[in-house]
């Protein structure tokens, strides 16, 4: 199969649909992979890192869509990409169709087969492709919270872990899902006094087991 990885063009999106390690696996299994020039740069993957594992670099997003049977992205296509998507093409990305009627109608009209990562579900009803994003969100929440405790940011000048003679910050995490657990784990690692609340007793007990 011919797989294409375009550069993300949505504002402030710096991720790339596939790392060189993922490309390497596809190439080893006989697939051809095209990567748009600069697609991985903002994620720390220069074009050369893709070329080393067998990918071919194309200059434009139009070139990638035109040649590829399957497109692998991170974020949903935006309006300039709609005309590039064709019937029979496979498109893998986070779509979030429910919040964007125009996107939904455009994809239906295109005739492409669209797989929304956020809807992939295991037998236990977990959403494995949302877990990495949720873990990042939880960790960033704690980091940002700690930053806004600093005086220059308008905070009280309190360290998360405290210092000798000064108690650590108290952190309340509402919700013990993947995001909440990740936030709580980072806060605890920084030495904060952490409390987690959740409506589910099962969720509350999970961090303890982990």
Residue ranges, per PLM feature:
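An N-terminal-biased, well-structured beta-alpha scaffold segment characteristic
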Residues: 2-110
